[in-house]
Amino acid sequence: LRRVILFLLISTAFITGIYASSTIPTQAWSRDVGASGYTDGAPIGGFGAGTITWKNNGDFYLSRLDIGTGDEAGSFTAANTNCKFFMYQKPASGAATVQRLDSANLGTGQAVYNSLFPFAWVNYSGSRFSVKAKVTQYSPIIPEDYQRVSYPVGVYEWELTNPTTQNYDAAIMLTWENPYGSSASLVTDGNYTGLVLNKAGTGTPTLETQGEFCLASLSSANVTVTRMSAANRAALETDFSTDGALSNTVGSNTIGAVAFKVTLAPGQTVRIPIILSWDIPITQSQYNAKWYRKYTQHFNRLGTNSWAIAREALADRAVWEQKLDEWVHRITDNPNYPEWLKSMLLNEMYIYFTAGTYWEAGGASGQADNPAENMFSHLESYIYDFYGTSDVRFYGSWALFMNWPEIDKQCIKQFADSVYNNRSDRPAGLGTTAHDIGSRADVFTRWNAYVYRDSTNWKDLNSKLVLMVYRDWHLTGRTDSDFLDYCWQSCKIAMEKTATQDADGDGLPDSNGIDQTYDDMDLTGDTSYCGGLYLASLLAAKELALAKGETALAQTYQERFDFAQPNFESQLWTGQYYKIDTGSHDPTRIMSDQLCGQWYNKALGLPGIVSDANAVSSFQKIYDNNFAKFGNGSHGVVNVMNANGTIDSTSSQTEECWVGTSWGVAAGMVHHGMEAQADDIGQSLLNTIWNTGQYWFRTPEAFRINLTMPRAMYYMRATAVWAVKHAYDSVHPAPTYTPS
């Protein structure tokens, strides 16, 4: 009965238009399928499941199924030529044509790719398409759905329209290869029809190169679904080209296809799905520690569940799509948000699926582990291949926190463990916050794979940990006592560690060269960056202490703030902005991140570390110099400017724009009523990343004037754009959302 109801619901969708997601929003990024330049696309898959990407030129690549695979140059995005979409068209009176749906065959002017993640669309409306086709791609990346966000599945909803005056036969085929396979099987369950490309062997998988794929669709009285396997793609094309159907035969092949076929009357539109799912239960680090992927908690670990996953997708995709559509439209329909923000918020979410994301469901190689804990982490970038990087996730965790807060809390607990723990399945605590929780070689098994600098004496990490703990506790209702209890001892140790870094007795941590997230930038003495973060953390720690009933300690934190804050003012305030530091070669330099602590406290509903008047003056100084005089305000905010309005070129990082810290500046501006300035910064970054720089789906950490020397593609920090959303939500009442 459930399937009958869902089938009727889906059938009537063509008339009622319940699939609002089939309408491409104006905020979606778009590009001709045949356009020259960098090619990539929105991924499918789930957290920790590995991902598959259908690029904007119509090519598929599968390399990220091996979690952690990637490099700075993007060479891993090479296409698998056995994985393709095809379209068959035949008029009632006339010959059939078959199009391979990629740029090499179509060229320009035939199709347009669009993305507003988690949706992507391709609209085939050129002269080669008498039957017009539009496909909507998505995975169930549903906020606060901690089950389906793990699923290794993608949905391709094909909408075919016959605008001609005669009947047309139309068919869509997806060909695929299982790089780990040995044979194929036909599978059917009522109207659900599919092909499984089986894993090699019959035993339970023990390697990340053991698993299977499923291609499936939905048959009906008017829709015929066929499938087959073959020795090569050419054989599948030949069979499909004959009549738009496949032979329903399988053998010992690793390549196969599924196709649906329908006859369209003049003016008729239909919507038919193709599902792509996989089951590769194990992932492993370079040092061969193995982990079960999170989705296996909801199926099993046998590596034979791709058909079960596909069936669930066929049954529930209408519900998934509705929930995703409501999420997207709460953003796109919000009149408080500028248009650039609507696009950036969603499209920058790709990083959680393409950045080597682990989400484990237990150790698979005998290592000590709590299988119910579900550790989660992703890379800082491919060139800096550290997991979790705490100083960066301070900015780059806002999207995760705002959509899946329980996952973010687990990430923070891992860093709390780096300070203090008495667990047998963790490395010993360091007495200070770790930079990371391992690299691609040894994720989850060590602290501080980063050795470029000695991060154990950095001046920002401990303050950032306390602020993230407070954020995740306070902004989720201040009710999660288990989370606070788990992190509290580490917070106290972290606060004392920073207090010991005050060398001159003014209550502020003293920098001694390179000792914070800007790890090629010398800072000396009191600094607006680290000092401001410490002031912010004192106010957060006070609130945590009060929640724990430690009133004397709360008073201590307040007293430390009251003592240090006037020194922050007297040492760093120039009358217009806060100096970068007190002891470098030029303390009067203008650092864009000087009010990072102010922004965070405003975001958390805490008192500011400086007056609003001083904050506004400082942000205006940053806007006038670090933004407006950096490429004439065309591509973000440069890290450091000289007081005379020239770019500070004393280090590589002073003369860079960092995308993520630029978002922190914009968020701080919004919190202080400077929306016009934030809007200019945001628009410049949208244009840079998704237009002139061609950085789509690989947003870098940094670039220099005129977009020279981009660095660290696929970078973690850029999802700080969600902090800008949080800022708008804080200063404007939320509008009432009514589903269409």
Where are these regions (language model features)?
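Extended glycan-interaction surfaces of carbohydrate-active proteins
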Residues: N334-Y382, V419-T456, Q501-G525, Q565-V659, ...
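Beta-strand-rich N-terminal accessory domains
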Residues: S21-P91
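Bacterial N-terminal signal peptides that target proteins for export
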Residues: L1-I5
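Aromatic-rich carbohydrate-recognition surfaces in CAZymes
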Residues: F86-A96, N162, Y295-R317, N374, ...
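Bacterial N-terminal signal peptides
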Residues: F7-T16
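Active-site core of glycosidic bond-cleaving carbohydrate-active enzymes
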Residues: T389-Y420, N462-K464, R471, L475, ...
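Acidic/polar, glycine-enriched structural segments that form the non-catalytic walls/loops
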Residues: S21-Q27, R31-D32, D40, G126-F129, ...
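Non-catalytic C-terminal accessory modules of carbohydrate-active enzymes
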Residues: D59-Y61, G68-E72, A79-F86, P91-Y138, ...
